[in-house]
Amino acid sequence: MNKSIAYIGTYTNGASEGIYRLCLDTDKGNIEDLSVVARFGNPTYLCIHNNKLYTVGNPLSLDTLGGVASYNIEEDYSLKLTGASLLQGKKPCHINIIPDKSLIVSSNFHEKSINTYSLNENFDIDTSLSAFSHKDDSKMHFASITPDNKFICAVNLGMDRIELFKINSNNTLSYIENLSFYCTKGCGPRHIEFSKNGKFAYVIC
């Protein structure tokens, strides 16, 4: 019998209560034991590193605060909240972990911003470090580390633009306008992946 555990992020504007866990029976193709493991508002994007789960979101029934949270994945696959950083405004839409720099980076579609957060020695979310925001039609949709581990590459859906940020020694970000560039007008870039050799970037529009 082959079974795998999976976690599902959701919108909580309706009946959903947060992050769900399920068991997938890969022999039978069945989903079993669906249950709520973390009650948190709108955890719409999740990422996992080792025994940690990170999510975007906001407190339930309070969407005037938004941010990121970290959880321990326990031995029974339940989740235990270990850290959070919430700011005034809408929640981010995407979250990414950069383990080598003990850093979390989030992209905020509604607030037009890229935010960084520090991780403590246990890789739990500690404090907010920096925020970069535009004042134009920007809609920040995704951000990730470049293959050389020196820059943050962000996808600006609202401006059809790929933007580069330098990671400073204190893990704050500096915008590098001369390395940023526009995609085809109206293409709507949403995500970027790099080839294994680091020579190519693939943009999903």
Tell me the role of every PLM-derived stretch:
Residues 32-38, 80-86, 128-134, 176-183:
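A short beta-strand motif characteristic of beta-propeller blades
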